[in-house]
């Protein structure tokens, strides 16, 4: 583990795999309260299940993006936990801050785990150092 306070690899991988589903929620609902149990942690038994969950979520997210009109981006969106507001702003800012920034952050953490376990890090914007060898 990168640090004792770091999220365990299995939990981190499940979170990254499930984040596209969270993006869909931001685009298709006015709010999400984690305390209501509508977004529960992904249970998995293999890396294949994680990839499948990510791919399915990414396809749903692509469809949701295509169905989101310009006016919807300005609509209010709220994230909470048992009634406590964690974020409140436009759907655009919710999507950017709560979904995109979150995905980038945890994807980078996952890359650190891969590197520390001598697993090739896949390309993001071009060939990774592992792919260039």
Model-derived segments and spans:
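Short flexible/disordered coil segments
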Residues: 56-71, 91-93, 128-133
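Acidic catalytic patch
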Residues: 67-83
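A general structural signal for well-ordered secondary-structure junctions
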Residues: 22, 60, 71-74, 120
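Short, contiguous alpha-helical
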Residues: 1-39, 80-133
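Helix-adjacent hinge/juxtasegments
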Residues: 25, 30-69
């Amino acid at each position: 583990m990168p640090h004792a306070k770091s999220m365990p690899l299995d939990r981190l991988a499940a979170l990254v795999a499930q984040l596209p589903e969270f993006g869909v929620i931001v685009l298709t609902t006015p709010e999400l309260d984690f305390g209501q149990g509508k977004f529960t942690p992904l249970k998995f038994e293999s890396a294949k299940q994680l990839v499948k969950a990510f791919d399915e979520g990414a396809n749903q997210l692509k469809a949701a993006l295509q169905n989101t009109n310009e006016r919807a981006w300005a609509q209010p969106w709220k994230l909470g936990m048992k009634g406590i507001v964690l974020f409140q702003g436009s759907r655009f800012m919710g999507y950017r801050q709560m979904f995109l920034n979150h995905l980038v952050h945890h994807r980078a953490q996952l890359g650190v785990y891969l590197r520390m376990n001598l697993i090739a890090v896949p390309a993001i914007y071009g060939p990774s150092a592992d792919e260039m060898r």
